Amino acid sequence: MDEPMNDAPGAQVKVTFTTNEADLQLPEEKRQLLVPADIRRYGLSRILNSDLMLDSGSIPFDFLVNGSFLRSSLEDYLNSEGLSLETNLTLQYVRSLIPPVFEASFEHDDWVSSVDALTATSPAGRWSGENFSRGQERILSASYDGLLRIWNASGEVLVTAPSASHGGHSASIKAAKFISSTQIASTGMDRSVRVWKYTDPGASGQAELKPTLELYGHRASVDSLEVHGPSKRILTASADGSVALWSASKSSSPEADASLLPNAHTSKRRKVASSVTTPQRGPLFLMQIHNAPATAAVFDPRDHTVGYSVSQDHTVKTLDLTTGSVVANLTLSHSLLSLCAIPRPNGAPLLAVGTSARHITLVDPRASAATTSVMTLRGHTNKVVALAANPENEYSLVSGSHDGTCRIWDLRSVRPASGGESEGGVGGNVSEPVYVFERESRQGKKKSVAGEGAKVFGVVWDRELGILSGGEDKKVQVNRGRDVVRE
């Protein structure tokens, strides 16, 4: 090992700049440079942005050294690694993720289980095409009080869903998504999937949320919901261990099993309790595929005929949604509680799976993959129940946990796992969060390691509105940072 370097006036370090970003490549002759030993990230970023280098203006950069972000001066880094002044450091420069700051929170009457965004760049906004207009950005929240609410970006409630007596859910809502700018799907503890027609405020200023379809097939709480707008397909996961595919269209939905309808075992008096009659239908497929509660199911980002599901039975399953069958099965070491698919340039996505063991496992679902677990993300202190991919790149995501925090992860920053850190405890890579933000409602209050009173239940990352999260504090919280998702 080289001798640690000594403090020396004017000491310099030879660095080699490299990047994987095609539009930010330096000419070969500019990649090696002598820089001051006491320089930090900001100084290195200024060098790269200078006229003699990239001439890129004011792009903030971070720098990776051996897979970890540089968080000190080069001098301090070399000393910490026991390296000498003569060491040639390779610095990989990447666009910075700017820390998201608290912007607003929207108060509810009960816990907020789920949140979604409707903007020009959100999935539902893109699927809506010309039917969506800028200035109509909306936030959808689902609550344990059994109600959906739609908000504008200023935090005003535009409309609240009807209660059970008027066609709404009869128990807590667990998940909700925009299918388009005019259609919403929701699921809940009442075992139902519901489709709603949303009418945005027009000249009258009156918004409307009207139930149009009730879907029955699950035999327990429906805890997860994913939608694909162009095909009007809905994918759900239930505590009964099943995963189901549905249509948001009445005409293409089969009849429901009569024994599963809410009126099947109730008295005549109870049957007429609702003043609204909504069509009731069943699933296109219902797959009884897990041996414990199914906690999440998602569509493949590039192929809606492929799905993925996870469960407390420790398994990740790849689903053929044209036949309703399982085509691949992976078994991990812990109960799996949340799931998101991170698109990759080619082939299958990377699956991020939140666990009861407080970490996130990145999984390659391809049967041909040499290693099932690609990376382990560590930092949460309680179970990880919500995940959302960055909408603008393929290397970052946000997680929500019962520890009361959301954490942002940058998959470009990795290190080899030490004993017991990776999924399965053997080999692999590990990453730590680059940013952590807590519930604003808990600021100034004594913090609980377990996150009591501040558990996060749902999170979504939108390019325009920022990171939206909901939780036990009965609030939707908005965190946004300038260029936080800049590609």
Swiss-Prot record:
Residues 13-95 are annotated as: Ubiquitin-like (UBL) domain. PROSITE patterns: WD_REPEATS_1, WD_REPEATS_2, WD_REPEATS_REGION. InterPro entries: G-protein_beta_WD-40_rep (IPR020472), NLE (IPR012972), WD40/YVTN_repeat-like_dom_sf (IPR015943), WD40_repeat_CS (IPR019775), WD40_repeat_dom_sf (IPR036322), WD40_rpt (IPR001680), WDR12/Ytm1 (IPR028599). Pfam families: NLE, WD40. GO terms for molecular function: ribonucleoprotein complex binding. Its main location: nucleus. It comes from the Eukaryota. GO terms for cellular component: nucleoplasm; PeBoW complex; preribosome, large subunit precursor. GO terms for biological process: maturation of 5.8S rRNA from tricistronic rRNA transcript (SSU-rRNA, 5.8S rRNA, LSU-rRNA); maturation of LSU-rRNA from tricistronic rRNA transcript (SSU-rRNA, 5.8S rRNA, LSU-rRNA). WD repeats lie at residues 122-161, 168-206, 217-256, 379-419, 451-487. Residues 253-277 are annotated as: Disordered. Gene3D superfamilies: YVTN repeat-like/Quinoprotein amine dehydrogenase (2.130.10.10). The keyword rRNA processing applies. The keyword Repeat applies. Keywords: Nucleus, Repeat, Ribosome biogenesis, rRNA processing, WD repeat. It is found in: Nucleus, Nucleolus; Nucleus, Nucleoplasm. Component of the NOP7 complex, which is required for maturation of the 25S and 5.8S ribosomal RNAs and formation of the 60S ribosome. Belongs to the WD repeat WDR12/YTM1 family. Component of the NOP7 complex, composed of ERB1, NOP7 and YTM1. The complex is held together by ERB1, which interacts with NOP7 via its N-terminal domain and with YTM1 via a high-affinity interaction between the seven-bladed beta-propeller domains of the 2 proteins. The NOP7 complex associates with the 66S pre-ribosome. Interacts (via UBL domain) with MDN1 (via VWFA/MIDAS domain). This is Ribosome biogenesis protein YTM1.
